[in-house]
Amino acid sequence: MAKVCQVTGKRPVTGHNVSHAKNHTKRRFLPNLHTHRFWVESEKRFVKLRVSSKGMRIIDKNGIETVLSDIRARGEKI
């Protein structure tokens, strides 16, 4: 399963670990993803989404119905 947020589209990015001696080694910065169940009142069921913590804040702000309609408009199956 891809490490991608279903709400924001956040995905891993690459960068460097930098030691005190300024040696650079490659690393990946991973998004803070959680699999979370949300209750959808209109459908009378839970929907399981893989969302980042920012995605959860967006759902709290806009509502799960609005966010689900945006995800479905992108063509993603839920």
UniProtKB/Swiss-Prot annotation:
InterPro entries with a match to the protein in the record: Ribosomal_bL28, Ribosomal_bL28/bL31-like_sf, Ribosomal_bL28_bact-type, Ribosomal_bL28_sf
Superkingdom field: Bacteria
Keywords noted in UniProt: Ribonucleoprotein, Ribosomal protein
Record-level GO BP terms: translation
An annotated GO cellular component: cytosolic large ribosomal subunit
Region of interest: Disordered: 1-22
GO molecular function: structural constituent of ribosome
PANTHER family according to UniProt: 39S RIBOSOMAL PROTEIN L28, MITOCHONDRIAL (PTHR13528), LARGE RIBOSOMAL SUBUNIT PROTEIN BL28M (PTHR13528:SF2)
Family of this protein: Belongs to the bacterial ribosomal protein bL28 family.
Full protein name: Large ribosomal subunit protein bL28
Highest classification ranks of the organism: Bacteria, Pseudomonadati, Pseudomonadota, Gammaproteobacteria, Cellvibrionales
